[in-house]
Amino acid sequence: MAKEKISEQELITRIRGEITGALGYMGDTISQQREQAMQYYYGLPFGNEVEGRSQYVDTTVQDTIEWIKPSLMRVFASGDEMVKFTPHGPEDVQMAEQATDYVNYVFTKDNPGWEILYSWFTDALLSKNGIVKVWWDEYENEEREEYRNLDENGLMVLISDDEVEVVEHTQHQQEGEPPYHDIVIKRKSYDGRIKIENVPPSEFLIARESKNIQEARFVCHRVLKTLSELKEMYPDEDLDPAELGGGDEDLMAFSGERLERYAYDKSAQYWEGWGDTDVEEEGLRTYWLHESFLKTDWDGDGITELRKVCTVGSKVLSNEEIDKIPFVSLTPVKIPHKFYGLSVADLVMDLQLIKSTLMRNLMDNMYNQNFGRYAVLEGQANLDDLLTQRPGGVVRVKSPNAVTPLATPALEPYTFQMLEYIDSVRESRAGVSRMSQGLNENALTSHTTATAVNAVMGAAQSRVELIARNFAETGVKDLMICIYELLYKNQDRERVVKLRNQWIPVRPDVWKDKYDCSVSVALGSGNKDQQMAHLSQMLSFAGDAMKGGLPIVNIQNMYNLGAALVRAMGFQNVDDFLTNPATIPPKQEGPSPKEQMEQAELQLKEKELEIKAADVQVKMQKIQQEYQKDAVDAQLKAAELNLESQQNRPVAIG
């Protein structure tokens, strides 16, 4: 028996149930942990402060995260290639190079790549997982155009375009002449681009048993939109504010995690309820839009398909089948078989509490040493004098031993040792040491070698490098593949962009499928100075090899080394300094000695033939001259004979 199609009300009920049961929903454990991490990041009070005592708050979480971020940004954003597609065969080389250049161009030029990476990494280091959303955004452009003195044919050609809308039209005609037209039009054009945006952790929901986004049963992005924005997004829908309500009947709009982001400077409302009901303009009232991506048997064929359902309150704005969930996640400490991992804040939050407690006790101890307590014999001292603390003050007593200071043990040496130990624990957990921060003045001495410093730095940074590799393999790589797929499926028009200092026409729809290429993220070791030193050594070795005639290096290898060195120096336009030998047209090589000899012999034979031909021509001319002479002689002889017969006497002519 065939199943019936799911009704819209059943779908809304399913979505509500998925939302309330999802991770990150309204104050669950994940949300509370992220809220606490934000409090620790800002260095806000713990809530256990005592009036009159020290209320110092350490910032270990903030310091650790802010020291890790420069290393991550240097790894991913310092080069000219965020991703590289490697061809599987010689026929894929040109396509892979163009895909590499264009995908990097889309990420860094069409989108704010640096800002996306910075916010993405910050969310992951602070809130367990960083989320970005990537999709193909189609948009419509309108351009105003004016034309004057058009004839009838020109007017018909112009307005016959379906994308043209006539705004103004004036017809002019003089007696005895055809009419002409002045016209103002709006020309519509449609295009699309890849869009990438960071998703706040508080706006992202995922089914509890999920291991990753693409295999999740349910994923939701809840975002605050004004009524005006909703009407622009869904122009065909009748959006009645009374029907929409507040866009949230179950208080899910309230999020302590989201509000904690603004707790440091109090820059947001403390209570976010059912939209901004105090806003007078109807178009500016806000509603919660839920973009739900769920697997459901919508058509009743017994097989679930992935659908995107957009809802505001109980109203469905769109319901369409899709092929992929448009989110990419990364986490610094991945836990196998789980979606959410651990953040750096999770690793060091307890250390911040311990250091804050130690520092509070130390400061209270110092206060007690400076303003200690006293044992006073009753009736033997003036208590008003004793309670008045001022320099040079006098305390009146009746006996020498009337006032005795109570001893306060000093905590300084023990506390500082404990703080050093806590810092070493942080180093082992997060990979951030005083040496890597540049704060240890005893790290470099006259006896410290560069190898020793590099060994210590490398050991301390291995944890950070592991985080970087985790980001590369679980997030950045997936993002670049998503960009490739979206370009391949949606961009069917040629676009001319500047790649490698040349204007190149790009048509991603003619590329091969992504599985013809592998993706590698540019995760290197060492800083720019080390890379330059290594490249210089390789360049010197390659030069010596070429001088020695070793066949292991050619001119193209030398160019590649030089180009890498130029890029490591910070210059991206390699062509300004070096010329790629592959672009130089080949020189016309001269003939070989054998060919030269054969050519000389051929020329000699040609000369001999020319001489023989000249001799033949001379002989022919001589024969012709003799023939002509004989003919003249014969004519003269005939004339003489004729005269002799007439005159009956001998005659000589000539």
Model-derived features: positions:
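Basic- and hydrophobic-enriched, low-structure N-terminal and domain-boundary segments
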Residues: 206-231
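C-terminal anchoring/interaction modules
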Residues: 1-55, 124, 132, 137-188, ...
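Small/polar low-complexity and glycine-rich loop motifs
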Residues: 176, 200, 204, 214
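Calcium-binding acidic motifs and repeat modules
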Residues: 306-311
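N-terminal-proximal low-complexity accessory segments that begin disordered
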Residues: 1-137, 200, 204
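Low-complexity, glycine- and small/polar-enriched segments
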Residues: 185-190, 196, 204, 210, ...
